[in-house]
Amino acid sequence: MASQKQMEVVTKGTGFRRRPKTITYTPGTCELLRVMMKESKLTNIQQRHIMDIMKRGDALPLQCSPTSSQRVLPSKQIASPIYLPPILAARPHLRPANMCQANGAYSREQFKPQATRDLEKEKQRLQNIFATGKDMEERKRKAPPARQKAPAPELDRFEELVKEIQERKEFLADMEALGQGKQYRGIILAEISQKLREMEDIDHRRSEELRKGLATT
């Protein structure tokens, strides 16, 4: 009667917990697992974990949990690409000198003097000036026309000297253009220097006259 009550209590209660069934691994199986662990390149910690499971007689895990050193780290955020400014176009290669010469890059345009006046006539004019000290052409230009009522005002000597110096400069430039500047350069420069001294004398004399005129007033 007592045993029957005891059976009823067991059946009505939670009952006994069943202990999981232990597995006995043969030495051959253990050796095979060791070889497989080496081939799988498991760490020492993972190998010891599996060996402990085998010693306890538990079922082998389907996946071996990685160690802390092998845990997958959170993927780093991919940095956004940096856009650099566009590179300037490369400088073109320099052409060799012989190619430049062939294309005429080094050729210079030859100077061609352009005579604006009759050089022979100008030379004759200057020779007359050197010989007589007078400019016949200038006198011809200054001659008043026959029908002119009032005579043209006579040019001031200072202005005449300025004009004569300018004419000699132009003549020397024309001779330089013809390659004959060396022949006339000394004479022309001497004439210009003489006329400059005469202009200085005129200027000095005018200054004295102006000073005297201001003193008398």
Swiss-Prot record:
Q: Which Pfam families match?
A: UPF0193 (PF05250)
By its UniProt entry, which InterPro entries does this protein fall under? UPF0193
Family (UniProt): Belongs to the UPF0193 (EVG1) family.
- What's the name of the protein? UPF0193 protein EVG1
